């Protein structure tokens, strides 16, 4: 019996599922928002939220745990230097899933996964770029 087993298999082997979630975590950290199917989005939320909680406290041990799960130095750096401090005061609920209709080919329910807060990006005004071109 499979009582108390809440894992979605997503029609994949365990190694494929692990690699897919790892890639989705890296993409979400890099782009801050991704488009995927609703079941994948719900599974992604289950694995990315503990990673952000881990990043709130920047220690060598936590960085090693994050690298063990992400396997990407750039993602770990952004996680601890940008996202961790951004969500320091928030006690959970770092991601949002927005349902966005159905995919054209197979009618699969699609969703948009994004962080609740986005990091501030320094905007370049048009005047400064025009001055730089001169």
From Swiss-Prot:
Highest taxon of source: Bacteria
Stored Gene3D superfamilies: Ribosomal protein L17
Keyword Amino-acid biosynthesis applies: no
SUPFAM superfamilies given in the database record: Prokaryotic ribosomal protein L17
Entry's Gene Ontology BP terms: translation
GO MF, any single term: structural constituent of ribosome
PROSITE patterns named among the record's database cross-references: RIBOSOMAL_L17
The entry's keywords: Ribonucleoprotein, Ribosomal protein
GO cellular component, as recorded: cytosolic large ribosomal subunit
Pfam families, per the entry: Ribosomal_L17 (PF01196)
Keyword Nucleotide-binding appears in the UniProt entry: no
Family the UniProt entry places it in: Belongs to the bacterial ribosomal protein bL17 family.
PANTHER family, A to Z: LARGE RIBOSOMAL SUBUNIT PROTEIN BL17M (PTHR14413:SF16), RIBOSOMAL PROTEIN L17 (PTHR14413)
Subunit structure: Part of the 50S ribosomal subunit. Contacts protein L32.
UniProt name for this protein: Large ribosomal subunit protein bL17
Underlying gene: rplQ
